[in-house]
Amino acid sequence: MNHSLYLVAGLGKTGLSIARYLKRNNKSFVVFDTRKEAPGLAEFQNEFPDVPIYLQQTPDEVISQVTDVITSPGLALDTPVLERARQAGASIYGDIECLAREISAPVIAITGTNGKSTVTTLVGEMAKAAGFRVAVAGNIGTPVLDMLDDEHHYDLWVLELSSFQLDLTYSLSPVVATILNVTPDHLDRHHTMEAYTQAKQRIYRGAKAVLFNREDVYTVPHQSCQADIKCISFGKDAPSMGNWGLIEQENTTYLAKGMERLLPVESILIKGVHNWMNALAACALAEAAGISMQHILNVLKTFPGLPHRCQWVREVDGVGWINDSKGTNIGATISAINGIGGSMQGKIVLIAGGQGKGADFQELAQPVSEFVRSIVLIGEDADKIESALAKVVPVVRASSLEGAVTIAKTCAKPGDVVLLSPACASLDMFRDFNHRGDVFTSSVRGL
């Protein structure tokens, strides 16, 4: 007889998917959320009318019976309920761990501060083109456990994983795993770069092959590659045999593996040096998982990129407008400024600001001084950004994103690009980064 009692910690999309998974497996469970108005509460109560739900507090007599806590990645590991459950002897893990225990199909695992969604989607498209039944999931789109049902049988899982998800995962053994890059982010949760990097490094555990960024020391595996683990790297320089990089020949830049030129960068639709790195990483991951080079390159030539990630909006009076609302941290914005600024004649007018998540905006000074004409600031941490950058370029303030678009139009000259890449989270003014990007795009289309 099974006496296990599961606690689902955190509602929302992930919590609902965990509850459905437990119900399918005939497990007893209760639910907890720190919020009084938990997202998805009405839907949960409609679907699970008999399951106890505790908001803001869980009684000790319940905690003492709990054997397993499956928590949403949004809940910090030092949340009191999780601490109490841990002290009472419960196992604590996340939905990716549940998936890892259930599936036998190979997994490609992808993390990194920036570029995860682009690379994950790109690898998924390459696998589809090669005829794989592929599940693209994790920190992107549908929660993994909603894809784990009797109707779907996948040949391959391509998982985008956040540092929070990796903190809660122990049994994943990917066919290939990568950390694309590591720059300061989520330091409000992880507190130090060391802890954040350590969380990312968990992705390599149990992997048959690892792909790292040879220009980013934080991505290099901490455990040196053992004989039975294949180590592959990518970077902007010319690659050594078996690795991936860029080769310059006769004024043309090529994506390359070893000495083999694969494709001129002009042939791919996603623009900027940072996107060339994303393309190289996707190629390396797909090939390591057994996808043919023909399918890989065909997809690269037609993949248009993802919304809100260095997405071209339009040109007005000789000025280009680019929506990079997904630039929610400094590293993403540095990549966007360097990637776009390094491939154009004019200057960038940068729209930035929002919730800075404890970041040090001084790190923007170097790329801003090289490529940016002026900055228009919005949002909660505008003061911090202004004090870090006001001596580098002219800084203007706007009370709304629509106002920032109007101001940016007057600052830009023909040949320039206006780039929305906020280097901040969006929740001070918007529902999420998608909403912020939609408001920007709509304002630009109205010019």
Curated annotation (Swiss-Prot):
Pathway assigned in UniProt: Cell wall biogenesis; peptidoglycan biosynthesis
Ligand binding (ATP): G112, T113, N114, G115, K116, S117, T118
Record GO biological process: cell division; cell wall organization; peptidoglycan biosynthetic process; regulation of cell shape
Entry annotated with the keyword Cell division: yes
Enzyme Commission designation: 6.3.2.9
Catalysed reactions, as listed in the record: UDP-N-acetyl-alpha-D-muramoyl-L-alanine + D-glutamate + ATP = UDP-N-acetyl-alpha-D-muramoyl-L-alanyl-D-glutamate + ADP + phosphate + H(+)
InterPro entries reported in the protein's UniProt record: Mur-like_cat_sf, Mur_ligase_C, Mur_ligase_C_dom_sf, Mur_ligase_cen, MurD
Name assigned to this protein: UDP-N-acetylmuramoylalanine--D-glutamate ligase
Gene this chain is encoded by: murD
Keywords tagged on the record: ATP-binding, Cell cycle, Cell division, Cell shape, Cell wall biogenesis/degradation, Cytoplasm, Ligase, Nucleotide-binding, Peptidoglycan synthesis
Superkingdom assignment: Bacteria
Family: Belongs to the MurCDEF family.
NCBIfam families assigned: murD
Sample GO molecular function, one term: ATP binding
Compartment annotation: Cytoplasm
Coiled coil: none
Enzyme class: ligase
Function: Cell wall formation. Catalyzes the addition of glutamate to the nucleotide precursor UDP-N-acetylmuramoyl-L-alanine (UMA).
Gene Ontology cellular-component annotations: cytoplasm
